Amino acid sequence: MADTTATLRDRREAVVREHMESENRHDFDATIATFARPRYEIVPTGDVYDGEEAVRAYFAASRAAFPDQRNEVKSIRHADDAVIAEFDLLGTHLGPLRALPPTGRAFRCRMSAHFIFEGDALVCERVYFDQLTIMRQLGLAHETTSLAGRATMLLSHPLTIGRAVARRVRR
C-alpha cells in the first residue's frame, strides 16, 4: 500500500508541477490538459471558473491585466485528496484589471493553492491569498493609518467618518 500511495503522490505532484510550469510558459492548452475537468476557485474574490471556456476566459483576463504573471513554487505538500502548493505570484499591472486601469506597478504575493484530485485526476484548483497585499503593491489601497489611507477613507465613507467624529466630539 505504501508503494501505491507514494506512486499516486508522485503522479499528482507531477501533474501540479506541469500545471504551474505551463502557466508560467502561458501554454494554457497544456494547463487545461492537466485537468480531468477544468475548475478554478479564487477564494478571496469568490470567483469560480467552471469548465474549459470559463477557465480560458479567466486566463485571458488575468494575463491581459498582468502579461508577465508567473509563479515561483516555494513548497509542495500532500493531503489525502489534494496537493497543496505554496508559491509567490508575481506580475506587473499593464492592462485593465476589471474596472481598474493599469498602474504599471509590480506585485509579489505569497499564495496557497489546493489542487483537488479524484484519484489521480485533477478536478479543481482552489487558490487562497490576501487581496490587500496585491492592492497595496499596485497603489490601489493604503494603510488606514497613513495620510493617503485616511484621505481615501474620508472620501469613500464620509457619513461613517462624520458620525465617528460627532461621537468623539460629544464625549
Task: Kindly give the residue locations of the regions a language model identified.
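C-terminal and inter-domain tail/linker signature
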Residues: 2-171
